[in-house]
Amino acid sequence: MNRFIALAVLVVGSSFAHAEDWSQFRGQNGTGISTEAGLPVKWSKSEGVRWSMPLPARGVSSPVVHGGKVYITCSSGALDNRLHVLAYDGKTGAKLWHRQLAATGGTNCHPMTCMAAPTPVADDTGVYAMFATGDLAAYDTDGTLRWYRSLVGDYPSITNQVGMASSPVLADGKLIVPMDNAGESFIAALDRKTGKNLWKINRERQINWVTPLVRTHDGKTEVIMSGRGVVTAYYGETGEKLWSQKDTGPSDIASATFQEGVLYSPGRGGTTALKAENGTFKELWKSPKLNGGMSSPLVYKNIVYAATGAGVVNAADAVTGKPLWDERFKGKASASPLAGDGKVYIFNEKGLTTVLKAADKAEILAENDLGEETLGTPAISGGAIFIRTDKTLFCIGAK
């Protein structure tokens, strides 16, 4: 028996030794797609769970996984002004460290969200955690505070009375911080070692919850930021505006994705497929059926998926926009769908995951219920799916 247990631990440890990092919101390139094989199909609270750990407080941010560590944020207190950053061992779920901050910005927000709404981003040196209060902290892998900034302290006019949720990302070795709000709106690149501004570009004052998308085109890193009525690409090195297009109807909640040079921009009127090169802009197609609301679209194996707040998954051809199928799932989705290993994962707000076969015809493979509120988008790494609920961090996968 001891030899069997040792072998099982070795197998799980080996999977993490070769695990694909999932270092930011929706994975390495922000598309929500894993390249790993052997991803789970069926699970419940009592079966198919590699480990689970109680969380100290609520959060709607996503977990991120880098170098075998799982990082997550939470917020607590009567005013939601106690901010938490935690690290767990990805193999065992053991808590590695837990750090707390006092919020410096306002904590007003919609009841559905909280101050732990932006997803952290990680690299080999540690994790960068931003909160809806405008507090931003960088920790080493061992939990040592490297630097801290109060963005509200630096820019006092920042305000959003329903909460902020845009997440930081990494581009060209810089920490990209989106800060669209009703006050001083901007997007900035920070030095990862010091937290100091490298460039800062002012943007139109607007409430916006979109996370930037990073892609490389013609040797240049583009940081693509959507907002109400406009999508803009900035040069990652300098912040120079590369291109911008108005009247595309982009969302101020769901984030864009891309595949093979095509940008899929979600909006209140559906999803638009855009081709942007060398300062020129072309709309390829627009589909009003692909309207995910708060959930970002997924493009996988040449199919675009949108999970709606009405409990319907719509699928369309990624090249033409032609509708392929729609399928009703239980509940409604706030989290964005993920994909990998030929499967598409749809997460509803009550903790039920619908697993679909990635195909041009609808086929439900499983429905898996954890029975806890799930608003944050999960992460995939080491053959496992990391799901954060309002109470628990689950690692779903074979033991």
What would you call each of these model-derived segments?
Residues M1-N2:
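N-terminal secretory signal peptides that target proteins for export/translocation
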Residues I5-S15:
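Bacterial N-terminal signal peptides
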Residues H18-K399:
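Noncatalytic, solvent-exposed loop/strand surfaces
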